[in-house]
């Protein structure tokens, strides 16, 4: 009897997200807690409905190459960037394959790039590795005084259009909070092929150490107050953005 109750409860929790069938709506978001197949298997065993793998950051790849190249020649930097990119991408593709080998729930790859060509190439390789969907972790602070209003939003749309021309799996866009009105952008993302939108990305917060007067990182972990802004715009989007 208890088994039947559990089965019926789980059945009622079944849902879909970005075209993926989920046994429940509990999705483990991208972090260091999803950076290995062993950890991801534990999430599935604990009852998660899907897993978003730790993001692959193009910026981190280039920064690592520059650090390795410190004090050497410019042409060596180009070589190291190429090597580091291929190495990190291969590691990530192996993470996808290894996780898919031990998990039956949907596995969503996550990428963060700043060049359009890299978004597309990474997405193609992740689909081939077996990812069930791709989350575009678009996280950027616009601080250019010559910024043209609307350019940032158009960049989001262009990225989705280019990637959807190359892959068949669902593409999900994770937006940052630095948007005046996310609703028109969400509408255009869906119109150009996005299967889902996540609100919002949590950026690293800055802080100042009053004892040393030095600049540093603020709180790393989030809190329940981070939900309020997301809940507001999720509610508005669910009503006003055409399905």
Task: Give the role of each language-model region.
Residues 6-27, 92-100:
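N-terminal amphipathic alpha-helix/helix-capping segment at the start of soluble metabolic enzymes
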Residues 20-27, 79-82, 170-171:
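Short, basic, glycine/proline-bearing loop/turn elements
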Residues 21-46:
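N-terminal phosphate-binding or glycine-rich loops at protein starts, especially the Walker A/P-loop
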Residues 27-31, 84-86, 175-176, 223-225:
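Short, flexible loop segments at the rims of nucleotide/cofactor-binding pockets, characterized by
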Residues 37-58, 63, 70, 93-97, ...:
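Alpha/beta enzyme core
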Residues 67-83:
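Active-site gating loops and adjacent loop-to-helix segments of metal-dependent hydrolytic enzymes
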Residues 79-90, 110-114:
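Short coil/turn segments at secondary-structure boundaries
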